[in-house]
A protein has these predicted regions:
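Secretory targeting and sorting signals
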Residues: 1-10
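The feature captures the conserved acid-bearing segment of alpha/beta-hydrolase catalytic domains
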Residues: 110, 245-313
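Domain-level recognition of soluble alpha/beta enzyme cores
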Residues: 11-116, 334-341, 352, 361
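Alpha/beta-hydrolase active-site loop
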Residues: 150-219
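C-terminal catalytic-base region of ester-bond hydrolases, centering on the histidine
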Residues: 16-21, 295-382
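Active-site machinery of serine-nucleophile hydrolases
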Residues: 59-62, 71-86, 127-168, 308
Length: 382
């Protein structure tokens, strides 16, 4: 989070957080993979090879399994410290170890499922899109969330090591290296999913995987969604990697410098596969030159959706978590807007599912054709 809000009254106990339950017909299983790219040096810590942690959620049979926490204790602590500094509250009020609706290592439901990759926003954790990910899984997708190591606040590996953020000061060149690194991360994750689908175990420690997980991956149907820099990552990856069939950008600029018109390849070249743009607040193609140029050069299905009463972090779990804090809603508005959190979350879930249903499952979705009375907060800019 980048905005700052006034001081809130101290609370002696953490606030009880929870995510809205997914509404699809499937229960949600979850597992983690530790992936090591021995062929690539880490761009932020050159003495190390590139290591990634990814979370795989999948339709599951949950008998005898237990729900998992939103974040591991080490990651939760670092994230709470950072967020509390922004919110000007005691970190003890932020308990990011609350239980999700995802069940650890549950057996996968038989059947091959389309796969959706998730890339988080800049300097954010892969955990912060859990509500959208759980919904997609409940609708029958496998969702793979990627932490971009040394950019996320903290990444915890199975042996207990915690990799903290290690980015140099912001600049155009650092931004280009950051997106290029994310694109390489995404391609490597796709390579490892291919190993998994062939019956192998790509986990660096060869930890036991959930029963039936590899057989559930249909890598002939792959989508990608990302928030902020993650949305830029989705587009840039699609330029160079044709394995991704459809992408969605949640409120992310696709420029390294708007003023210098230094845009990504996805903007300058466009795409020949479907792409969804979702924005909030004052951000849209009307205000973002990179989006306008992208839409001019795009050569396939595209749609822009807008939540005028939302803000940048509307497209993360902060939308439903922050309103539970004892903070004036007006003070939270620069982060998550004034849109009703439940309506906003329901709308995002519905439109994102419809997008992937139409373009990965080839099921026409009238919801994408124009405004809906069911989701009055969403606009269709001309």
């Amino acid at each position: 989070m980048a905005a700052s809000v006034p001081t809130a009254a101290a609370s002696p106990l953490p606030v009880r957080f929870e995510l809205p339950a997914p509404t699809g017909p499937y229960s949600v299983g979850i597992t983690e993979l530790h992936l090591v790219d021995q062929a690539r040096q880490d761009p932020w810590v050159p003495t190390a090879v590139r290591e990634l942690m990814v979370t795989i959620r999948y339709p599951a049979t949950v008998n005898g399994t237990s729900p998992t926490p939103f974040m591991s204790p080490a990651v939760a602590e670092v994230t709470a410290d950072e967020d509390a500094a922004t919110l000007k509250i005691d970190p003890a009020e932020l308990d990011y170890g609350f239980t999700t609706h995802s069940n650890l290592n549950a057996h996968a439901v038989p059947g091959r499922r389309p796969v959706v990759l998730y890339s988080p926003g800049g300097s954010r954790s892969r955990s912060m899109g859990a509500s959208l990910m759980e919904q997609l899984v409940s609708e029958g997708y496998v969702v793979v969330a990627i932490d971009h190591t040394h950019e996320a606040p903290a990444v915890e590996f199975p042996d207990g090591r915690v990799a903290r953020r290690a980015l140099p000061p912001s600049s155009i060149e650092v931004g280009k290296r950051l997106i290029a690194t994310r694109v390489q991360d995404t391609g490597f994750v796709l390579d490892q999913l291919e190993v998994l689908a062939r019956g192998g175990n790509p986990d660096a420690g060869r930890r036991r995987l959930p029963h039936g997980l590899g057989r559930s991956l249909d890598l002939g149907r792959i989508g990608m969604v990302g928030h902020s820099a993650g949305g830029f990552t989705a587009g840039e990856t699609m330029v160079s990697d044709r394995r991704i069939d459809a992408g969605a950008n949640l409120d992310g600029s696709m420029a390294y410098s708007q003023s210098a018109r230094d845009f990504g390849r996805v903007v300058n070249e466009g795409l020949d596969r479907p792409f969804l743009l979702m924005s909030a607040g004052n951000h849209s193609a009307a205000s973002d030159p990179s989006w306008r140029e992208f839409l001019t050069n795009h050569r396939a299905w595209a749609r822009q959706l807008h939540l005028p009463e939302g803000e940048h972090f509307t497209f993360t779990d902060y939308q439903v978590l922050l309103p539970r804090l004892d903070i004036d809603p007006a003070a939270l508005a620069p982060l998550i807007g004034t849109v009703d959190p439940a309506r906003s979350t329901a709308a995002q879930r519905a439109y994102l599912t419809a997008f992937f249903d139409q373009h990965l499952r080839h099921r026409p979705q009238p919801l994408l054709d124009g405004p809906s009375d069911r989701y009055p907060d969403v606009r269709f800019p001309s």
